[in-house]
Amino acid sequence: MAVYLGMLRLGRLCVASLGARGPRTPLSRPWPNSKLQGVRAFSSGMVDCTNPLPIGGLSYIQGHTDSHLVNKTVGECLDATAQRFPNREALVIIHENIRLNFAQLKEEVDRAASGLLSIGLRKGDRLGMWGPNSYAWVLIQLATAQAGIILVSVNPAYQASELEYVLRKVGCKGIVFPKQFKTQQYYNILKQVCPELEKAQPGALKSERLPDLTTVISVDAPLPGTLLLDEVVAAGGKEQNLAQLRYHQGFLSCYDPINIQFTSGTTGNPKGATLSHHNIVNNSNLIGQRLKMPAKTAEELRMVLPCPLYHCLGSVGGTMVSVVHGATLLLSSPSFNGKKALEAISREKGTLLYGTPTMFVDILNQPDFSSYDFTTIRGGVIAGSLAPPELIRAIISKMNMKELVVVYGTTENSPVTFMNFPEDTLEQKAGSVGRIMPHTEAQIVNMETGELTKLNMPGELCIRGYCVMQGYWGEPQKTFETVGQDRWYRTGDIASMDEQGFCRIVGRSKDMIIRGGENIYPAELEDFFHKHPQVQEAQVVGVKDDRMGEEICACIRLKSGETTTEEEIKAFCKGKISHFKIPRYIVFVEGYPLTVSGKIQKFKLREQMEQHLKL
């Protein structure tokens, strides 16, 4: 089986699901006859400049712990960086022509945080941010943390039913969005859920379907029932409001929740992975250390980020790494654009480039690729999906990115747990997802017995450490099914570990589809297709694709006597589910491959579809 690379599995998780062995057993409950659980207390070790090794010939490894974890809030990190590098360029929003140094960014964030408090939001309230990459996104991310408000990262492609679910799930008190981006009309979509908005007093919405939602903030246009973001920020500049902010900050703790990022599993319903300041600050600090940022000059710390900010890769690996390490964050476009990413590297002298494999494929295939200047670029991060070894080699050779690193993680782990060192060899980068991060434990266990596997033997990858989320918002049972009392997080990924501690992801224990870095959950789509009046049953699988990694294939069995077409099924999807969830392939079938007990064998179904589609 091909090795899986670059897998920052944004949204991968382990939930209770019925499989051949029945319900998944939480890790805190002992497996039968288990003798080796990998339960080992953190001990002193080397700092993150040498390589920890597996212990005792078994698939257990512990990252170094001599460098201390940081007990600061996000706001304290921004304050410290602004004091240390006040005139260093902090943020460049190329498509909005915005440039701020760290002193200016801190001032703007303080005003925005003060403004949010002035309109009645308080510590612990949930505020959704819904839209493409923008200055407003970064501002709200940092301002909510500064005020103790919990940011809810909302996928900008969500349609009305998806938006309603996540806002209700976490009880959002407020939401921020632009009026429109491309064909996505945010205000009109929200009105489908909250028809009361149009006649509501700004800041005093009373919605039947979203009873917790009172405050709607528009980024760029005065709209009925909304507050304008500029006015909120302006109100925050008043001295009495800034004094209120300083008062509230005295009650913040680094262990407070700061961010809810939605992730899902084969059961289909999204769950809100809840992360604290401590989770995110330390993960971003350790990412930057692994990238050797503390030893770099300002000119060497210019990160080009074409990845979405609602994902961990963008918000933690991008924004927070910038805040903690004083790196310049360059947002190249509101949504991914390969040409704009190349222009940012060339014109802004970018030194690091983040991206998913699909993004890098598009960048390498730009018609005018050879006309861009790559003299400043030295490395970057590839994550989010399957990255073939040939792609890793092409990026390094064609883009001068000798310090490219492959990253693996999950939303529930803040997110990064394995990562290459920049100096790792080409073969080490092309053949693994790197080495364990500091202050993190990993073990690979037999899924039947729970015992540690021997080196180079596959099993389920489990993670423990500061990085593990606080839990799924409002779902203690699902949290326990994923993170037991012993705090081991079960990733659901099948992995192996070699003698040097390199981790290889060799498979998945669930049927999640990863299309161009987006996690697609088959059960969610299957439930959706069952709403079609002519559909008897639907099964969704991922089939291989050279560009996207995987594409969605819907295998549909129609009701007796009914007929429909591929085009009609796709038309049924538009406007009801996110564009990236609409299947590329629709195949009408008479039945599905089954086990003796009647369970559908999705791996066989996938094979059948790839043969049928001649992939």
Swiss-Prot record:
Range of the transit peptide: 1-49
Modified residues (N6-acetyllysine): K179, K182, K199, K340, K398, K510, K544, K570
Ligand binding (ATP): T263, S264, G265, T266, T267, G268, N269, P270, K271, D493, R508, K599
Metal-binding as UniProt keyword: no
PROSITE patterns: AMP_BINDING
GO biological process: fatty acid metabolic process
Molecular function as annotated in GO: ATP binding; medium-chain fatty acid-CoA ligase activity
UniProt KW keywords: Acetylation, ATP-binding, Fatty acid metabolism, Ligase, Lipid metabolism, Mitochondrion, Nucleotide-binding, Transit peptide
Catalysis: reaction(s): a medium-chain fatty acid + ATP + CoA = a medium-chain fatty acyl-CoA + AMP + diphosphate; octanoate + ATP + CoA = octanoyl-CoA + AMP + diphosphate
Superkingdom, natural source: Eukaryota
EC number: 6.2.1.2
Modified residues (N6-succinyllysine): K182, K478, K544, K570, K599
One GO CC annotation: mitochondrion
CDD domains listed in its UniProt record: FACL_like_2 (cd05917)
Subcellular location: Mitochondrion
Keyword Mitochondrion attributed: yes
InterPro entries linked: AMP-bd_C, AMP-bd_C_sf, AMP-binding_CS, AMP-dep_synth/lig_dom, ANL_N_sf
Function: Acyl-CoA synthases catalyze the initial reaction in fatty acid metabolism, by forming a thioester with CoA. Has some preference toward medium-chain substrates. Plays a role in adipocyte differentiation.
UniProt similarity note: Belongs to the ATP-dependent AMP-binding enzyme family.
PANTHER family: ACYL-COA SYNTHETASE (PTHR43201), MEDIUM-CHAIN ACYL-COA LIGASE ACSF2, MITOCHONDRIAL (PTHR43201:SF5)
Protein name: Medium-chain acyl-CoA ligase ACSF2, mitochondrial
